[in-house]
A protein has these predicted regions:
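Short, acidic Ser/Thr/Gly-rich low-complexity loop/linker segments typical of extracellular
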Residues: 47-61
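Surface-exposed extracellular loop regions of Gram-negative outer-membrane beta-barrel proteins
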Residues: 485, 510-557, 574-592, 707-722
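N-terminal periplasmic accessory domains that precede
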Residues: 96-101, 111, 141-144, 160-162, ...
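Extracytoplasmic beta-strand/coil segments of soluble accessory domains associated
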Residues: 142-177
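Short acidic/polar hinge/loop motifs at secondary-structure boundaries
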Residues: 175-202, 304
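Short, acidic, small-residue-rich periplasmic hinge/interaction motif at the N-terminus
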Residues: 40-44, 77-79, 95-134, 143, ...
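Outer membrane beta-barrel strand-and-loop segments of large Gram-negative receptors
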Residues: 413-415, 455, 461, 546, ...
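Face-selective signature of the C-terminal outer-membrane beta-barrel domain
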Residues: 299-327, 350-500, 507, 568-576, ...
Length: 772
């Protein structure tokens, strides 16, 4: 009898535990007998720790799943409505709250409607809930991101790019998995529940990640989804088109996505001023005056995907990708020595390049008991690169200099990664992982100078990171061990590293917080720089690889303060970076009096960057203004040079939306970069955009640089022996008109899509370039 009681009790406890792991909270938000669409719904603990959140659908409904037993507060708010808080004490079973009534309210302050903040500051990320107006006026996931105005994030709809003011890349994700920009372009705004913004990402996201933007989207069931996003110019060969299809059947999902990019302009040219100084003290300056020529590029990206989910317990995903890119460039210029302008030579340069990159990505994710998870990912990639370049200098049809070079490259790589995560307490989490990468590059160089390279590269890392929160104080500490190996014939290196990372934050109130972040990382030389290869640039210059390059160390420190008051918000950010023995360029004269441009481990490089960002809006739910400005100070020390440089930059943007219409105007001046001995001028541009949305169709237009007729970019080289300055121009980048159409349709979707949480990729071909 006692055994039966014990067995029955055990079974009952197990059922309660299993049931508690799938607690649901749902309801319907109504005001004056009408459903409230896109109301913000947030579930949090009694001490304001975020648990789950989202927005109501078109019928005012919401549902939150997989909630653990406990006591919570359900906060409901919406633009033009009073907020309501519902206490959910001792929640242990699923609960249907039924109809929840909220009252209309409009608070006016000097003719401006003040709305509640939609940003929740969690310990390791910011949780941003889109407003109803943003969801209705945005045409896709990218335009929604632009309207949400995340701090230190820049959205460029003309080029379909998302960048950060900080050093590194921006990772785009959907439900935790790395997503391509093409996925965001065909994402329906109404499917977005919230955006989780990791502006200080942890070790699991990699060393070169400035920010992670994770779209948390609705999970659908059976049916399918078709979407198209087309962006094309009627007067210039300029286009970016995306198409995606997803079909669900029971526990399986099949997907196909295709992207096509093309560019072609007939009015591209460059101007160069190059000075060459010899050991005997003599020197001369050569001038290159460009003649308008053609450049073109196009690419295709195809992905086939299959995934299988078993009731949210485990998830398998397989993806086969193929990317193809081809470019052509023709340059014509007149060459002459500044001291002898009458002696003119004609320069002709023609180059083509082609890259084919197939890959296979296998992914497995498993949810374990006690709030644990395990992720395993394996990616294999092959990159086939073919390029050739011809360069001549001469008079009429008599070449005085004739250079021809070809590169045939083959690179094979494998990336394997495993991640384990566990929630230790309600306010702390442990994350640990291992990653292994193996690469083999086999390149053949031909033409005037021939050579072959075979390079092997291995990287292995393991990390552990612990994060938590105590009242208003939050922290994170991580430690990463790494091993790097490179071998080319008898040359190479082996390097072991132990790298710490620290994050400390304090939240003074819901609207003010301050954070410090420090880390040490290593940077490896690229395979393209380490090949024992020489490539002729022109009659005077040579580009050379350097197999003696070594890994170098990077130290980063960041201090940030964020504040919000009504319609005003701001961010103050101060960063300092120091690189010890960085790989930077140098120019030397060889025994043949040729000027050899190569890379070497130099002494140090420093960058100091204070930045201020201010935002105002939305004013009457129509206008939003933003302005950011900063200063970059660089200190670059080489073995035989020392340069300092200071650059002031700014960026301004105004956005407007009214009913189904939305528009924006953004402008940015040169944000220059100085590294080694090279000053690279950033873009100075402005863009105007207007769009109209009707149901699932969004049509619009954009104009790049509508108010100028001279677009250029360039740079300077401050070498002692061969300084230079260059500008290159693209006439078609002025008053470039682009029409845009976005359309999507879904049918019968009820299957809950579970996304993978990591994605690895290899896109570096590892070949040395020979052009200027």
């Amino acid at each position: 009898m006692i055994k039966r009681i014990l067995v029955a009790t055990s079974l009952l406890c197990m059922c309660c535990i299993l049931f508690a792991q799938n607690v649901q909270v749902k309801g319907k938000v109504v005001s004056e007998n009408e459903a409230v669409e896109f109301a913000n719904v947030v579930l949090q603990t009694k001490d304001s720790i975020f648990i789950a959140g989202g927005v109501t659908d078109s019928k005012g409904r919401f549902m939150m799943e997989n909630i653990q037993a406990g006591s919570y507060l359900l906060c409901i708010s919406g633009m033009g409505y009073t907020s309501r808080i519902i206490s959910l004490d001792h929640l242990a079973v699923s609960k249907d709250l039924g109809v929840i009534m909220i009252s209309p309210e409009s608070i006016l302050l000097k003719e401006v409607v003040v709305t509640g903040a939609s940003v929740i500051n969690a310990a390791d990320r910011k949780i941003i809930l889109p407003t109803a107006h943003q969801l209705k006026s945005a045409g896709n996931g990218l335009s929604l991101l632009q309207q949400m105005k995340l701090s230190r994030i820049q959205v460029d709809q003309m080029r379909n790019k998302v960048t950060s003011s900080g050093e590194g890349d921006v990772q785009l994700r959907m439900n935790g998995v790395n997503a391509e920009i093409q996925d965001i372009l065909v994402l329906r705004p109404e499917d977005v529940i919230r955006i989780e913004y990791h502006d200080a990402p942890g070790l699991r996201y990699g060393d070169n990640t400035a920010a992670v933007i994770d779209y948390i989207v609705r999970r659908h069931e059976t049916g399918g989804y078709v979407a198209l996003d087309a962006q094309d110019s009627p007067h210039v060969l300029f286009g970016n088109n995306n198409f995606i299809v997803k079909i669900n059947h029971k526990k399986s999902e099949f997907g196909l996505n295709y992207n096509n990019v093309y560019r072609s302009v007939d009015n591209y040219w460059r101007n160069n001023w190059e000075t060459f100084r010899y050991e005997d003290g003599s020197s001369f300056t050569r001038v290159e005056d460009g003649i308008p020529s053609r450049i073109s590029t196009y690419g295709h990206n195809i992905g086939l995907n299959y995934s299988f989910q078993d009731q949210g317990k485990w998830f398998f995903n397989s993806t086969v990708r193929w990317a193809f890119n081809k470019n052509k460039q023709n340059n014509q210029s007149s060459l002459y020595i500044l001291e002898k302008p009458e002696e003119i030579l004609m320069m002709k340069e023609h180059s083509t390049g082609r890259t084919s990159r197939p890959s296979v990505d296998l992914y497995f994710q498993c949810k374990l008991n006690n709030d644990q998870s395990l992720i395993i990912n394996a990616v294999t990639t092959y990159i086939d690169t073919q390029s050739d370049r011809s360069y001549t200098e001469g008079k009429s049809n008599e070449p005085l200099t004739d250079i021809y070079s070809t590169v045939s490259g083959n690179k094979y790589s494998f990336i394997g990664e495993g991640i384990y995560e566990r929630k230790v307490t309600k306010k702390s989490r442990l994350s640990a992982g291992v990653k292994y990468q193996q690469s083999l590059a086999d390149n053949t160089y031909g033409g005037n100078e021939s050579s072959e390279t075979k390079m092997h590269e291995t990287h292995a890392t393991a990390y552990v990171e612990y994060s938590g929160k105590m009242d208003r104080f939050n922290y994170s500490f991580g430690l990463q061990g790494s091993y790097a190996r490179f071998k080319q014939k008898e040359e190479g290196y082996n390097r072991y590293s132990l790298l710490p990372r620290l994050r400390l934050g304090y939240q003074f109130s819901d609207n003010v917080f301050i954070r410090y972040r420090g880390q040490i990382s290593r940077k490896s030389p690229g395979l393209s720089d380490m090949g024992n290869v020489r490539q002729l640039i022109d009659s005077l210059q040579v580009r050379s690889g350097n197999p003696e390059l070594k890994i170098f160390t990077v130290y980063k420190n960041e201090l940030e303060a964020d504040f919000r008051k009504g319609l005003f918000s701001g961010n103050v950010h101060l960063s300092y970076q120091y690189q010890h023995r960085p790989i930077m360029e140098e120019t030397i004269r060889d025994k043949n009096n040729s000027f050899v441009r190569t890379n070497a481990n130099q002494l140090s490089w420093q960058k100091l960057n204070p930045e201020l960002e201010l935002k105002l809006g939305p004013l009457k739910d129509i206008l939003t203004f933003s302005f950011s400005t900063g200063i970059n100070y660089y200190d670059s020390r080489g073995l035989d040079y020392h340069h300092t440089y200071t650059n002031w930059y700014y960026r301004a943007e105004v956005m407007a939306s009214y009913k189904r219409w939305s528009g924006f105007f953004q402008m940015e001046n040169h944000r220059n970069n100085f590294y080694g001995e090279t000053l690279s001028y950033g873009e100075s541009f402005h863009t105007l955009g207007l769009s109209y949305r009707y149901k699932r169709l969004n049509i619009g237009m954009m104009i790049l640089n509508p108010f100028v007729d001279n677009y250029r970019m360039g740079g300077e080289m401050f070498s002692k022996v061969a300084p230079s300055k260059n500008w290159w121009y693209v006439k078609e980048s002025c008053r470039l008109f682009v029409a845009k159409v976005s359309w999507n349709i879904s049918f019968g979707r009820k299957y809950e899509t579970m996304q993978k949480r990591v994605n690895n990729e290899d896109s570096n071909a590892g070949t040395l370039k020979s052009g200027k």
